[in-house]
Curated annotation (Swiss-Prot):
The keyword Cytoplasm does not apply. The gene is Acadm. GO terms for cellular component: axon; mitochondrial matrix; mitochondrial membrane; mitochondrion. Belongs to the acyl-CoA dehydrogenase family. This is Medium-chain specific acyl-CoA dehydrogenase, mitochondrial. Gene3D superfamilies: Acyl-CoA dehydrogenase/oxidase, N-terminal domain (1.10.540.10), Butyryl-CoA Dehydrogenase, subunit A, domain 2 (2.40.110.10), Butyryl-CoA Dehydrogenase, subunit A, domain 3 (1.20.140.10). FAD binds at residues 158-167, 191-193, 306-308, 316-317, 374-378, 402-405. It comes from Mus musculus (Mouse). Pathway: Lipid metabolism; mitochondrial fatty acid beta-oxidation. The active site is at E401 (proton acceptor). Its main location: mitochondrion.
Length: 421
């Protein structure tokens, strides 16, 4: 019965998505001269957003503090999100998914992050792990590895970062040596989200040992089953924030991977790995906006309740101005991720906008979390109140999926290139 319900839910939401895209297309052709574009969501997008919002507020927020304290993996919440169609929604319809675009996925992500970014990151790691397969997998690979994700609440992971290769992806040392119809992989990965929970990994390894070969041709992307002999999963890391998310190191010792699990072909891995970021960075930015919105809401609620010097905090100009600045920032950050998502859904290269969204939203999340703690005063520094968790959770948005500094390098490069042309 549960399986039948799941299938029915998939069909219903697939129809909704088709209608959503159709309405979007029709609206574009019916616009009045000079209107340009609309900020209005379609009814289907509002439904996705409302479903995610209800789930976050009613099911995530009440238990988020306990998951933060225990560090326990939030599988019950992930399973529920899967049942609601809030996870893996971008998997193509041909593989049993909903085939949602990046914009729709961002709407869902922002709402989930409002509830808890640890839970949202565990879910979002699936998107990053799956994206190389969505972009570069053949039909057989997609049906095998993406299809199974729609039949059961499974997880996957993106295995690229290493102990000495974070932002400098080209410094990866994990090696893949071809032997007959297999590749033998040796190396170590680090800071892998869902590392201990994944059913399979996207793994980037150097397949050409010649250091003179450019990164664009030196690396190969593989799909690796998590239970393959030779894979050793490290302990769960205790991080500053987003503690319920599963982060680990993974060692690969003579791991044999069939050639059928190579994405596109030998040497194509670097471009695949980097191309995935154009589609996942907008959703990371959306997660940061969700946290920022939560910080603003918590600070506003507190300022409307707390009294000092005989009047409400919000009646003090200094506090009201701070809230105004917070509101300005969260709205602008939201627009940045929506532009980046809209660009890629429109079929255009969005590297420039994706990096702007990721960098700006990550910075704003940290600023607003800090401002919320400031408005709470001493209470904000205490674990009995929600904003200290927001402050801890926010920092990683300036680090993972490309640091704030790397985003600025990308933005500068893209900007200068645009100016020259």
């Amino acid at each position: 019965m549960a399986a039948a319900f799941r299938r029915g839910c998939r069909v219903l939401r697939s129809v909704s998505h088709f209608e959503c895209r159709t309405q979007h297309s029709k609206a574009a052709h019916k616009q009045e001269p000079g209107l340009g574009f609309s900020f209005e969501l379609t009814e289907q997008q509002k439904e996705f957003q409302a479903t995610a919002r209800k789930f976050a507020r009613e099911e995530i927020i009440p238990v988020a503090p306990e998951y933060d304290k225990s560090g326990e993996y939030p599988f019950p919440l992930i399973k529920r999100a899967w049942e609601l169609g809030l996870i893996n929604a971008h998997i193509p319809e041909s593989c049993g998914g909903l085939g949602l675009g990046t914009f729709d996925a961002c709407l869902i992500t922002e709402e989930l992050a409002y509830g808890c970014t640890g839970v949202q990151t565990a879910i979002e790691a699936n998107s990053l792990g799956q994206m190389p397969v969505i972009l570069a997998g053949n039909d057989q690979q997609k049906k095998k590895y993406l299809g199974r994700m729609t039949e059961q609440p499974m997880m996957c992971a993106y295995c690229v970062t290493e102990p000495s290769a974070g932002s400098d992806v080209a410094a990866i040392k994990t090696k893949a040596e071809k032997k007959g119809d297999e590749y033998v992989i040796n190396g170590q990965k680090m800071w892998i989200t869902n590392g201990g929970k994944a059913n399979w990994y996207f793994l980037l390894a150097r397949s050409n040992p010649d250091p003179k070969v450019p990164a664009s041709k030196a690396f190969t992307g593989f799909i690796v089953e998590a239970d393959t002999p030779g894979i050793h999963i490290g302990k769960k890391e205790l991080n500053m924030g987003q503690r319920c998310s599963d982060t680990r190191g993974i060692a690969f010792e003579d791991v044999r991977v069939p050639k059928e699990n190579v994405l596109i072909g030998e040497g194509a891995g670097f471009k695949i790995a980097m191309g995935a970021f154009d589609r996942t960075r907008p959703t990371v930015a959306a997660g940061a906006v969700g946290l920022a919105q939560r910080a603003l809401d918590e600070a506003t609620k507190y300022a409307l309740d707390r009294k000092t010097f005989g009047k409400l905090l919000v009646e003090h100009q200094g506090v009201s101005f701070l809230l105004a600045e917070m509101a300005m920032k969260v709205e602008l950050a939201r627009l940045s991720y929506q532009r980046a998502a809209w660009e890629v859904d429109s079929g255009r290269r969005n590297t420039y906008y994706a990096s702007i969204a990721k960098a700006f939203a990550g910075d704003i999340a940290n600023q607003l979390a800090t401002d919320a703690v400031q408005i709470f005063g001493g209470y904000g520094f205490n674990t009995e109140y929600p904003v200290e968790k927001l402050m801890r959770d926010a920092k990683i948005y300036q680090i993972y999926e490309g640091t704030a500094q790397i985003q600025r390098l990308i933005i500068a490069r893209e900007h200068i290139e645009k100016y020259k042309n």
